[in-house]
Each structure stands twice: as structure tokens, then as C-alpha cells.
């Protein structure tokens, strides 16, 4: 038997050896240096910005309670698509207290982990402050209705798997579940904010949402790096969580009143649709992790990795089917607009 044959045999055996099953406490300890390193990296590249710099305050005026005029639909300068997308993004950001609780419970508030959780929360809070100020000052939405939606959304909270929210398998039962979910979710949110800015067709809104989307991208990189490090420590456990998250993925704003209807408007308008979810979120992250190239996944982990192909195939079909439906919908809308114009 040649030396190369022996080496190949040993390598093959290594790939079938059961891997250590880490507890969340052990993973928190193993990943702590990575968290500290990436927090420092994040702070080094983060560009400070202030919400008040991107609000056209000169357009503002008192509402009726202070002797001014209450909101009127004619005051809105945004398209229906931009308005729906802005409201959905804002209400999603409004649930930050619930997200903070989920992250803090699945991570820890001790040491570098706690430093990151609090920094992430502080940066995220800017987003709702800025978007709300913009919408209220420019009178782009009904502020009374917006406040009612905020209260209802926050009362519902964000507790996947509890209070009949989203089913038992939708979100995080473990540390890996949590970091895998936010790796995809933060990137999805970045895409949504960026495209909402374009849909607004208004320079100040576009600049504001560019800053917010940049924040989300940096958050995604942090969490993506956590999963990447986790794949080196416990590849089978990590790929199992990645599979779970992708097989049950939904955006965190799913508790928003009218979310399904708004999601259709947002998708049809090209802000965030099945194709962008696949091509701009799922596939780039999986490529970065080299999921299908790794040679350290075996046993149960290999089954979950192979089944990712089924999930991706399903996402491709969903994207293709949606494009067909979207085309027919837009054609109907165009014909309706022509008929309305002919009556004028």
C-alpha cells in the first residue's frame, strides 16, 4: 500500500468520525475572541452619522394640536410603493426592544458579547428615529395611523415559536440558529432599505436610507463572520442551523398588521422580491461560507448540506413563478390605467 493510499484512507476516516456536540455555553466561550476581534473591526470601519442631518426640517410645520394643520393625504409626495416600503421598514425597526431581548437571551450580556449586543442595539435604534422623523416632518404618511401601527406592532412583539408566532421551527433555539438567522436577515434588510431609497425618488430619503443600509451591511458582516468561525469549530452543528433558518426563513416584520399585503406591494415594485432574496442574500452568503466546498462536514451534517440544494431549487422556482405572476399583474395594471385615462 502506498503512502498516498494510507493518507487518503485516513482522511476518509476522519470525515466520518462523529464530531463533538458543543453546548451553547461552550460555543459562547469558543467564539468570544472572534466576537471581540470583530467588534473592534466593526468600530474601526463604522462611519458615524446623525439622523438629524438627513431630515428636511425646513419643510416641517405644526400639527393641529399646536395650532397647525393635521395631515392630509394630498401632502404625501411619495409613491404608494415608497410609502408602503418606508412604513414596513420603520415598523420592522420599531420592534427593536424585542429583537434586543431575543439576541441577549441567545447570546450573553457578559464580556465582548454584551459589548456587541449593546452597540448593535444603539446603532439599530438610529434607524427608527431617522425614518420616523423623515416621514412625520415631510408629512409623507398619516402620523396618527403610524403611531397606532407602532403600538400594535410592539404589543405583538417578536417571539417566534411563542404566542402562536410563526410556528415552532421558525427561529432560534440555539446560538447557531440565532447568528445564522441574523446573517441572512441583516443582508435582506440592507437590500430592502437600499431599494426603498431608490423607490422614494427623493434625494434626502435616498441618502438617509443609504446610511441605514450601510449599517445593516456591517451588521451582516459581523454575524456572517461569527457563523464562518462557527463552521470551523462545529461544522455539522453550524450547517444544521443554516439549513433550519433557510428552510423556515421569514423577515422579522412578519408580525406587522397587513404584512402579507404590503409584502406583495414591495415585491411587485422590485424593492424586495423572491429573486433578490435568492440572488442578493442567500447565494452570496452561502458562497462566502463555502458551504458546498467544505470537506469537514459529515454524517448528519452532510444530509443537511445536501438538502440545501432542495431549498435553493425551491427558491429558484418561487422566484420564477413570481416573475410570471408579476408580469401578468403589471399588464393588468397597465390596461386598467389605459381605461381610466380614456374615461377622462
Report the location of each language-model feature.
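Non-heme di-metal
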Residues: 2-344
